[in-house]
Structure formats: C-alpha cells, structure tokens
C-alpha cells in the first residue's frame, strides 16, 4: 500500500480501457463501402453459411461486418452503415451492418423485432 506522501508525489495511474470496436473511433455508427460480400462458416459446435462483407470505412479502416436477417441485397460497392457488436461464432467479425439504412434494404416479410431489421410497420 502506498503512503499518502508517495501518492502526493506520484498519483495512481488511470487504467486504460481498450475498445472492442476500434474502427468506429468513438462513434455510434460509421459509413463504408462493401469491398467483398461472401459467406463463411462458424466456429466448432455450430454449422451454417453466415453472410458477411468486407467494408472500407470513411476513416480508412477495412473491417468485416455481419449481415443479419434472412436474405440481403448487398454487393460490391454498396454503401452500408456499420454498428458495433460482435458475432460470437465468427472470429474477427466485430461489427454488424445496419439493415434498412443507406443501400442495405430491410428484411422482407419481417413481422416481429422489426426495428432491428429496418422494416416499416405493416398496413394492418
């Protein structure tokens, strides 16, 4: 334990918190252009073809982003909005594309949890 005198001379160092989403640069979302749209397989206990895309962000970062929901309209040169949020069974995928923003369309025929997939309220 440090004495009061020692703490007066040299205060305690603040702990630096490392960001889980460095490419966002402390912003809630970032815009980017798809450089590659492809599918990849998840880690060991799971099996699927997960839809992901490589995105070149406006700040120069190139990141891998997950495309949630059933079906998508993204291709190379599509402009997308990226938010934070990793995909646990895809190593290196730390971002999600925002559905229903910019060039990324919302999910078709989605009735529940619509706000997460960029779907307007259906005409009852």
Curated annotation (Swiss-Prot):
- A Pfam family recorded for this sequence: Ribosom_S12_S23
Positions of modified residues (3-methylthioaspartic acid): 89
Cellular component terms per the entry's GO annotation? ribosome; small ribosomal subunit
Question: What are the GO MF terms of this UniProt record?
Answer: rRNA binding; structural constituent of ribosome; tRNA binding
Annotated Gene3D superfamilies: Nucleic acid-binding proteins (2.40.50.140)
What GO biological process terms does the UniProt entry carry, in alphabetical order?
translation
Q: Which PROSITE patterns match?
A: RIBOSOMAL_S12 (PS00055)
UniProt keywords, alphabetically = Methylation, Ribonucleoprotein, Ribosomal protein, RNA-binding, rRNA-binding, tRNA-binding
Q: Which residues form the signal peptide?
A: none
InterPro entries attached to this UniProt entry: NA-bd_OB-fold, Ribosomal_uS12, Ribosomal_uS12_bac
Family in the record: Belongs to the universal ribosomal protein uS12 family.
NCBIfam families in UniProt: rpsL_bact
Q: What role is this protein assigned?
A: With S4 and S5 plays an important role in translational accuracy. Interacts with and stabilizes bases of the 16S rRNA that are involved in tRNA selection in the A site and with the mRNA backbone. Located at the interface of the 30S and 50S subunits, it traverses the body of the 30S subunit contacting proteins on the other side and probably holding the rRNA structure together. The combined cluster of proteins S8, S12 and S17 appears to hold together the shoulder and platform of the 30S subunit.
Under the subunit heading, UniProt states: Part of the 30S ribosomal subunit. Contacts proteins S8 and S17. May interact with IF1 in the 30S initiation complex.
Protein name as annotated: Small ribosomal subunit protein uS12
Provenance organism: Vibrio cholerae serotype O1 (strain ATCC 39315 / El Tor Inaba N16961)
- What taxonomic ancestry is recorded? Bacteria, Pseudomonadati, Pseudomonadota, Gammaproteobacteria, Vibrionales
Record gene name: rpsL
């Amino acid at each position: 334990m440090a004495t009061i005198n020692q703490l007066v001379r040299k205060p305690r160092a603040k702990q630096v918190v490392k960001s889980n989403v460095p490419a966002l640069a402390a912003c809630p979302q970032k815009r980017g252009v798809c450089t590659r749209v492809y599918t990849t397989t998840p880690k060991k206990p799971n099996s699927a073809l997960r839809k992901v895309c490589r995105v070149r962000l406006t700040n120069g970062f190139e990141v891998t982003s997950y495309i949630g929901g059933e079906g998508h309209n993204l291709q190379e040169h599509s402009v997308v909005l990226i938010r934070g949020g990793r995909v646990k069974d895809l190593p290196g995928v730390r971002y999600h594309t925002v559905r229903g923003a910019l060039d990324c369309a919302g999910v078709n025929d989605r009735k529940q949890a619509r706000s997460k997939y960029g779907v307007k309220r259906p005409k009852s």
